[in-house]
Amino acid sequence: METSPLLQKVDAVTIPVPDLESGLRFYRDALGHELLWRHDGIGQAGLGLPGSDTEIVLTTRQDYEPNWLVASADDAARAVERAGGRVISPPGDIPVGRLAVVADPFGNALVLLDLSRGRYAVDEERQVTGLTG
């Protein structure tokens, strides 16, 4: 029986910043990355990478990276644990779906993210207004 790999793609690379405004001044204004969404309530903003749907996520609260897209964060966390890794932070709800933090047997942290609730919907100013899908 053929199975597909657990990690589907890099969904986002998170970059800790002291505050969103200074992070946006650098990554958006100085480096030219397009603002895709901004969620002040959770202290994050997503920026585009040309030719890719992987995002740069500026964050004031989270320091794990990269974020790996998986079909189910719950199933993926169990699979990593069965394979000899460990769960650092059990699966929990996030605005767009579910997220778990695991470590491989070598101590590398992996953020496992599913988009079971959809992606962010934004207004003309790129502020998050809800979810799509």
Language model: regions and residue ranges:
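Vicinal oxygen chelate
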Residues: 19-20, 67-109
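Hydrophobic pocket/interface hotspot
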Residues: 13, 23, 27, 76, ...
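N-terminal beta-strand motif that seeds the catalytic metal site of vicinal oxygen chelate
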Residues: 1-24, 53, 64-66, 116-133
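Short aromatic/hydrophobic contact patches that present stacked aromatics
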Residues: 12-14, 46, 57, 65-67, ...
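Conserved acetyl-CoA-binding loop of GNAT-fold acetyltransferases
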Residues: 29-36, 84-86
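Conserved short beta-strand elements that form part of the metal-binding/catalytic scaffold
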Residues: 34-64, 109-115
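Conserved beta-strand edge residues that scaffold enzyme active sites
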Residues: 41-42, 93-95, 121
